[in-house]
């Protein structure tokens, strides 16, 4: 999430643009680059900074997160407010795959798709959560990332080439192969909910370019 958060702050003009985090575990890099680097050593300690985004702590913390699955609905609120007030700021929700299994996140997706709000939802599908993810939506995302064609191709590549000084190059090839094989299935659910879906980003170097393209060229 570090590269993604740096990319978001490079492309979007926070605090005018609203970057909304789901819970606080993805927001540490955000806190460090928004004036709290020295205070971060006291993160989650008595009299230290909060472990979660906190509006009273920084103007860059657009929404006070705590409970999971709230980011999409909160970002939708900012987007609707911008439209009603005639303000030009953008609204972004960053949510992990664990939080996306919560009912409030699904409600937010449904309402956002209907509203056609000018906002961006980023799914950080890192397969990390405090407890094991459960539910139909998790199973859907799991099927996307465990496509058998991708795994078979990956196994053949590594079995055939083994250890090599070109390992880094081969890892990039595998990532590109994964992107190609799953791109056709990844967006069906989100498109059905009314979203314009963009293929996932597997290479950190492409984060800034992809975000700039979306920020400048698309109104949702």
Regions from the language model: what does each represent?
Residues 25-26, 36-40, 46-49, 116, ...:
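Alpha-helix initiation and N-capping motif
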Residues 127-215, 220:
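Long, well-ordered, tryptophan-enriched scaffold segments
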Residues 91, 119-120, 197:
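Hydrophobic anchor at the start of a short beta-strand
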Residues 1-115:
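Cofactor-binding active-site loop characterized by glycine-rich and histidine/acidic residues
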């Amino acid at each position: 999430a570090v590269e993604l958060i740096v990319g978001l702050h490079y492309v979007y003009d926070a605090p005018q643009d609203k970057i909304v985090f789901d819970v606080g575990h993805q927001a540490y890099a955000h806190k460090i680059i928004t004036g709290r680097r020295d205070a971060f050593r006291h993160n989650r300690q008595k009299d230290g900074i909060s472990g979660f985004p906190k509006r009273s702590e920084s103007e860059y913390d657009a929404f006070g997160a705590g409970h999971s699955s709230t980011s999409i609905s909160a970002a939708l609120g900012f987007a609707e407010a911008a439209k009603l007030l005639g303000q030009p700021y953008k609204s972004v929700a960053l949510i992990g795959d664990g939080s996306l299994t919560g009912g409030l996140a699904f409600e937010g997706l449904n309402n956002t798709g209907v509203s056609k709000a000018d906002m961006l939802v980023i799914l950080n599908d890192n397969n990390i959560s405090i407890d094991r993810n459960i539910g139909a939506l998790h199973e859907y995302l799991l099927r996307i990332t465990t496509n058998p064609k991708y795994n078979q191709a990956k196994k053949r590549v590594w079995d055939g080439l083994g250890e090599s000084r070109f390992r880094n190059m081969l890892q990039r090839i595998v990532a590109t192969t994964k992107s190609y094989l799953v791109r056709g299935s990844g967006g069906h659910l989100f498109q059905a909910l009314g979203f314009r879906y963009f293929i996932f980003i597997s290479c950190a170097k492409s984060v800034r370019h992809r975000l700039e393209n979306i920020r400048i060229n698309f109104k949702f």
